[in-house]
């Protein structure tokens, strides 16, 4: 019976984690280029198989019987499916039709620069003509993006895209920027060979992990268009209701076991 308490407890912890993921998805349902996340869990037999190598601590006594207790939180994964497009008629807005990312030179609060990747193509132009993100980070050109190892871009702002702010420009599907009839730069659109080597950094950016390989992208660039989030609000809300009910069910299990233990200790003990 006591094992049932821990089984229900781990179930509640798992549902809390799933709720956090769902809440984050809903909060970013209107974020340009946002990719939804999902949460997995491990069943009893899977937990038992890896238990001997498991160093994580979930506050569950390991010595309670020979069978693993409850469910363990698995990995949180990212769904990279394409989001819908929205035409903006803003020449500084870009969307990628296919797999790939825009490479940018990101500067953190400590003033340290590194290359990050994003699907959010809502850019703007500085008075000096540099193409930047809404947060002021340089958008890299193709050469700098491909040469990057995720730590540096080899000479930003030399690797940044600089246009003549007094002239109009067009961008073709290959990302080539045409100004006054000449190609002046190419958007740094790249892909990652294995998506297991990138993770969300925050601020709608992705970070390349050690061992990750940057490759050229086959995605087509759409100017005056933005990719929206791939979050389905209705689906996420249904999942949230399901998760809430699962959490409440585990609560009721704990309450029922607690009542039974109380009765065994108090009522039966008096007989």
Task: Give residue spans per PLM region.
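Amphipathic alpha-helical polymerization modules
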Residues: 1-271
